Design a protein with these regions (language model features):
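Helix-hairpin-helix
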Residues: 18, 147, 186-205
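Short beta-strand-to-loop capping motifs
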Residues: 116-122
C-alpha cells in the first residue's frame, strides 16, 4: 500500500541558499583566472583534500591524501590551495549579509548556507525572487550559489540538492505543488534526504 503524502501548506515556504563548492569559489572570486580550472583546497597541514570544485571532483574525492594524488593533480592541471579561513570567513559574512537583506527572519545555518523564511508569501513569484538572489550574490561577491525553495526545511534541502545536479534548473529548484514534490522525491536517492542517517536508511531499504 502506498503512503499518502500530507498536503502542502501554501502559506509556508522556506528557501535554502548555499555557496557552490564554497572554499573553491572563494578562491575563484579573488583570482578570476581560476574560472574554468579544476581546484582543490587542502586541509590546514596540506594533508588531504577538503574541498573540490565540480571540475576537480571528476578526479579527486574528499579526504584523498595530497601526496597520493600528486600525479593526478599534474596530469589534469588541477590548481591546489592551502586553506585560507580568513578569506572564507570574510566572504561567508558578506554572502550571509546578502541573503539576510532579502529576509528579516534569515537563519544562518553554516559557513556557506542558510534558510530564508517566505511564510505567508503564497502567490509570490519565487522564480523571479530566486533568480534575483542568485544574481545579486554572484555580482556582489563573485560566489555562485544554488537555491532550493519548498514548504519545509527538509524539502528545501532536497530542492537545493536538485538545483545543484539538474543543470537545466540553473541553480534554482522550486517545490510549490504536490506534483513537483512527488517529482523531486522520485529524483532524489533516499540516502540524500536530509535527516535520514545510516541507521534509518538501512531500515527502509
Amino acid at each position: 500500500m502506498s503512503q499518502k503524502l500530507l498536503p502542502l501548506n501554501p502559506r509556508q515556504m522556506v528557501g535554502l541558499a548555499d555557496g557552490n563548492s564554497f572554499y573553491c569559489s572563494c578562491e575563484e572570486s579573488v583570482q578570476p583566472w581560476l574560472y574554468g580550472k579544476p581546484i582543490i583546497v587542502a586541509s590546514n597541514n596540506d594533508g588531504c583534500a577538503i574541498a573540490m570544485n565540480r571540475l576537480a571532483k571528476k578526479y579527486v574525492k574528499m579526504g584523498d591524501a595530497m601526496f597520493q594524488i600528486t600525479d593526478t593533480i599534474r596530469e589534469h592541471g588541477i590548481v591546489t590551495f592551502s586553506s585560507n579561513y580568513e578569506l572564507y570567513g570574510d566572504l561567508s559574512n558578506r554572502m550571509h549579509s546578502i541573503f539576510s537583506s532579502y529576509n528579516p527572519n534569515y537563519e544562518r545555518y553554516s559557513i556557506d548556507e542558510g534558510f530564508l523564511d517566505f511564510t505567508g508569501m503564497e502567490g509570490f513569484d519565487f522564480e523571479k525572487l530566486g533568480r534575483d538572489i542568485i544574481r545579486s550574490t554572484r555580482r556582489g561577491i563573485g560566489i555562485p550559489i544554488c537555491l532550493g525553495i519548498a514548504p519545509t526545511k527538509v524539502l528545501a534541502k532536497a530542492a537545493n540538492k536538485l538545483a545543484k545536479t539538474d543543470d537545466a534548473r540553473r541553480g534554482l529548484y522550486i517545490i510549490d505543488t504536490e506534483e513537483k514534490r512527488v517529482e523531486a522525491l522520485k529524483k532524489l536517492p533516499i540516502g540524500d534526504v536530509w535527516g535520514i542517517g545510516n541507521a534509518t536508511y538501512d531500515k527502509i531499504t
